[in-house]
């Protein structure tokens, strides 16, 4: 059986032939444009490669899947059903409806087709340069390195989100070649190889990007090399589907990439067009609009509660949970003082807000908002959108040391940068190492270095990069039971290929996160109230 798949991606069309049997194949490619006409000038080619990065950014940072993934990670909560937020965070977790008519199809189709659009553009650019169809002169290497970066970033995200995918590069002949769906691990291997190829080009050359390729800054080749190393480290750590796989990551390699990685925060500058911006990130834009959009989930901030409020909330069935005011010891949430009307004065990143107005089950209610990104909204999206904080490198380094028998004093020093500096807690020096099974907990009477790492990483990086907390909690084994561990290939493509529809998620069903210790009879207090 053979199928010809065509999807309009807003760029030169990608025609993918899927091999489902062993027959000879006669293909008439009626949809792919004449590349020599479409890319007739150096300007055309450079615009294609430049735009591929924006395609990658938009495919992941826009509201789908960015806000979609924030809900099943239990870091944000929202009353709206937009972007699959309601369905993906329902408790008990439900099976994902993967049909071409499903209201959730956009959660999968947006990143799937958007990322392959970015890959297609980058690949067309590389192919035309290497074939000599168009030359950019001294800027050839700049274009090739940037295109390789986009190929790797895009394949890497597909591997994080989906259970399988296609591998596409300049060596694939779309007119007569064969693309097969392969496991996510193979897709990530290809992504890292492409990112390493980009690093080789960056390290062998000295150039500067125009400041609108990654909006707002003219990055040098040396800076791009550092960025790419950090993304490899991030992707390696986030790929695992469970804690056994997480422990088996090549953490020594992660450390090597961190050593060559970013030395300052990285991101883009918004273009000042508000919600209509092309450089737009859903969580950055909506997180401070807490009255009608996102609020902070108690499962993120609750471990900081010094009262019994959070433990009482956890002890109830989801349908019986409701919003409450915490006695948090974290100065990011509350500065420890009260206003004249008795309201908690804001912390450095969050604040107590009014009663929830959401129309949804009360387990999704919250009295706390996240205002770290408020300038994104108040400036109409004309400020930096940070996508990679230096603290992420510190957290990755700390975890790598935990897995490889590193110094606990070094681990404590890395965690203390945010734990003491932002949270206002005492030093973690002297805490036991613990294990990956430990629940997030910043309170030192029960905390371990592992529990502080989990709490600090999700607090400090909240909303920073699309899906980050979702991938983290998946690898640590901390997703709510039944949460799908990855997404299926969108039904639209499965139907075009003549393949059986399939899906994931739901309590006790394939592809759903397993039960945690607190749900199989262990004492909650002994388990540090793992949720």
Model regions and ranges:
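Acidic/polar-rich alpha-helix caps and helix-coil junctions
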Residues: 22-67, 102-291, 341-531
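Detector for intrinsically disordered, low-structure N-terminal pre-sequences
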Residues: 14-15, 324, 349
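Acidic side chains
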Residues: 72-74, 189, 305, 322, ...
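Short alpha-helical hairpin
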Residues: 75-101, 356-373
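Sec-dependent bacterial lipoprotein signal peptides
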Residues: 1-20
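Acidic, Ser/Thr/Pro-rich intrinsically disordered transcriptional activation regions
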Residues: 49, 53-91
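C-terminal amphipathic alpha-helical segment
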Residues: 295-340
